[in-house]
Regions:
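Beta-strand elements of repeat-based all-beta scaffolds
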Residues: 1-524
């Protein structure tokens, strides 16, 4: 693979791939910058010297995959790049097995005996489950048990002689009913029936229930009260209730418009169970209804308290909200040409999220109203916010061709008349890597410059103030697997060690950190 002129200095980045005689991926080399920028084919003979030079004469600059001797072409061993892994036999090994009646390959058989109980009935018969055993570079073992329908029924992790089992239990329709955590699996390792109120199920397990249409009607997390869901005729979840809401006699509602967009959500203060299964609930914007300007085709939520309202397809909602002329003007678009010109007219705004109103849960009188404006490509370039406590906030941004923020201006107008303005300008290279970022707060600026190595890894950051009164530079280093190994500056430095610790820790080859050493200034 050749990425034409993709390196920071405009050179090609090449990744070599080798295949075995059966056409299977065998070796994948690390990317490397070349001396050309034409995008032409590069052979191994021409790239290998560049690999050695770029990766500090590392010989094993590739990952390697070995396959079993069968038509299934299943991988059995994989080495990542790096001589420490290849020469020390630190690979990821995969074995394909079947379950057994006893030992580490046995799997408990859990059945859903009723809507409110779970039964453990011995173990799965030998040979009825396929088992994939994965051993990582540090010898950590994971066993994944799958039934004949392709469903995972057990994931077992081994910590020495200790088994950490996560069981997945399905009903006759194939729906997930229970997920047993390792603690729950250990507590239910003997045969028996366990009700939903039993300690292992209620306190340590995930429990799911479904209605007659296969929709999740109740979900309970370990140690939590169940969350109940109610659906409409279109299978949309329109009401939900957790344990605290049941105590207060409340439901959370969420209604969508005819296009499936979330329109209004909030609290319905009622202890009775809503019945919406017979109708498709649709929120329609009228501008005068009590639910933030929306009306719905069911009666139950008419007295609901909206907490979040979303508006689409235009800005007519600003005329219908109870806003003063000053506030309405604050939410209108600006004409700052440096940040693009927002489009107007409902035909240009079809399908776009143009505004919102969010009410505080603790203070129902506190409402934040926002209006969003877009350019002719449908990209947001302005947002204006009327915030109950902090005043007004205006955000303008210009974008690159691909939509990355190029220049952003955020102004906050405080209730006491003060105003703060933060302007951020960004520069990108040809591959849209961030090269510099300059932020100016009320005229005082600071710049952060970023540098990259030949394959695009961040290798340096430099901070400087606009008046030159202070500056700071830091560098970052990586290993051959792109894992961060160090960060250094004149005020803080750190080293992350994995496979080659120097302070007596156990070497780690699977990516985990074995040692972290840091220093601040002259100390450590």
């Amino acid at each position: 693979t050749v990425q034409t002129a993709a390196s920071p200095d405009g050179k090609d980045i090449v990744t070599l791939n080798e295949y075995d005689s059966f056409g299977r991926p065998y070796s994948v080399y690390r990317p490397v910058p070349t001396q050309t920028s034409s995008g032409a084919y590069a052979s191994f003979a021409s790239i290998n010297p560049e690999l050695l030079k770029f990766y500090n004469w590392e010989v094993y600059t590739f990952s390697k995959t070995l396959y079993e001797d069968s038509p299934l072409d299943r991988p059995v061993e994989k080495y990542g790049p790096g001589s420490l892994w290849h020469t020390r036999g630190k690979s990821v090994r995969t074995e394909y097995l079947v379950n057994e009646a006893t030992g580490v390959l046995s799997c408990g058989l859990y059945l859903v005996s009723s809507d409110t109980s779970l039964t453990r009935s011995g173990v799965f018969p030998s040979g009825s489950l396929s088992v994939v055993k994965t051993t990582d570079e540090d010898g950590d073992v994971t066993l994944s048990f799958t039934d004949r329908l392709g469903r995972k029924v057990l994931e077992r992790r081994l910590d020495g002689d200790i088994r950490l089992d996560t069981h997945y239990v399905y009903d006759d329709l194939g729906l997930t009913r229970y997920v047993l955590t390792p603690e729950a699996s250990a507590a239910m390792s003997s045969d028996g029936t366990f009700g939903d109120s039993s300690a292992p199920v209620a306190g340590l397990s995930y429990v799911y229930k479904y209605d007659g249409k296969g929709r999740c009607s109740s979900k309970r997390l370990p140690g939590r009260s169940p969350v109940i869901y109610k659906y409409d005729k279109g299978d949309e979840p329109v009401f939900s209730q957790d344990g605290r809401m049941r105590e207060r006699g409340e439901w959370m509602f969420s209604f969508r418009d005819a296009l499936g967009r979330e329109a209004v959500s909030g609290i319905w203060p009622s202890s009775r169970t809503p019945d919406t299964d017979g109708a498709t609930v649709i929120a329609t914007y009228t501008g005068t209804a009590s639910l933030g300007g929306y009306s719905v085709n069911v009666q139950t939520p008419a007295i609901g308290v909206p907490l979040s309202v979303n508006y689409y397809d235009g800005h007519s909602f600003l005329e219908n909200l109870r806003l003063s002329d000053t506030d309405r003007l604050a939410l209108s678009p600006d004409t700052l040409s440096a940040y693009g010109v927002p489009v107007t007219g409902s035909n240009r705004l079809k399908g776009l999220h143009t505004g919102s109103a969010v009410r505080s849960v603790t203070d129902p009188e506190s409402v934040t109203v926002s209006a969003f404006y877009y350019d002719r490509r449908g990209r947001q370039i302005q947002s204006h916010h009327l915030e109950a406590l902090s005043g007004r906030r205006h955000v303008h941004q210009s974008l690159t061709f691909t939509g990355k923020p190029l220049r952003t201006r955020e102004t906050v107008e405080l209730p006491d008349g003060r105003a703060d303005s933060l302007v951020t300008s960004r520069l990108y290279d040809s591959q849209e890597r961030l090269v510099s970022e300059t932020s100016s707060l009320n005229g005082k600026s600071q710049t952060v410059a970023y540098s990259y190595d030949g394959i695009g890894r961040l290798t340096g950051r430099s901070y400087s103030s606009g008046d030159g009164s202070h500056s700071l530079s830091e560098s970052l280093t990586y290993d051959i697997r792109d894992q961060l190994t160090g960060l250094s500056s004149n005020v803080f430095s750190m080293s992350l060690r994995r496979q080659e610790p120097v302070l007596g820790a156990t070497p780690r080859y699977n990516g985990n950190i074995s040692e972290w050493e840091w220093s601040r200034g002259a100390g450590s």
